[in-house]
Regions:
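A short, charged, and often flexible helix/loop element on the N-terminal side
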Residues: 38-63, 101-106
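Conserved donor-binding/catalytic core segment of Leloir-type glycosyltransferases
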Residues: 167-183, 189-192
Length: 193
């Protein structure tokens, strides 16, 4: 979600119709620097463990959002604040990533993420997905019942990464990514081999 937020926050800040607030833990502040001057940053003490972070996300964020009069709480992390009905969530991480992972801790993590995502879908005001696949795969068969609450918002490609029309293409593909299963690099290699 960090890369996504670093790219979307300046765009949202440029929209004069929005009053943008960013809730960050102290240990996240440096990651998001520089923050657009039109964004109000709310700093919270860093949490010592994942349970503390989850408690902060689920309790402190909706309380603070209510206090500042926020109309919407946006979460780019598949799930939102379950205690709030003001959520807009972004579905982007496929649960299929855990299939090839033998670690019990990862299975538990992804299972809990699945439960949180399901509950968030039931509570969210709006559900955004990065692709048709993400919408189908991450809504547990509910996509067809969500109607206008669900919307696919394709990320797109920055024009800097599109060749000029007059450039002759060479026969190679440059892929810049980490090796997470959801990147589907194995199938890309098979497709071009």
């Amino acid at each position: 979600g960090v890369t996504y937020l670093r790219n979307i926050v300046p765009r949202l800040a440029a929209d004069s119709r929005l009053e943008l607030h960013l809730f960050l833990l102290e240990d996240q502040i440096e990651t998001f620097q520089p923050v657009d001057r039109r964004v109000r940053v709310h700093r919270f003490p860093a949490r010592q463990n994942m349970l503390g972070t989850i408690a902060w996300e689920q309790a402190a964020i909706p309380c603070r959002a209510r206090k500042i009069g926020a109309d919407v709480i946006f979460s780019p992390a598949n799930f939102g604040c379950l205690l709030s009905g003001r959520n807009v969530i972004l579905l982007r991480n496929a649960f299929a990533v855990v299939r090839g992972d033998p670690r019990a801790g990862r299975w538990f993590y992804w299972s809990m993420l699945g439960v949180a995502t399901f509950l968030s879908i039931l509570r969210a005001r709006k559900i955004l997905a990065v692709s048709d696949y993400a919408l189908r795969a991450l809504t547990f068969g509910l996509a067809r019942f969500l109607g206008r609450r669900a919307l696919v918002v394709h990320h797109g490609v920055d024009p800097r990464f599109s060749p000029d029309a007059g450039v002759i293409r060479e026969k190679f593909i440059l892929v810049v990514a980490d090796l997470y299963v959801q990147k589907n690099l194995l199938n890309l290699i098979r497709a071009v081999a």
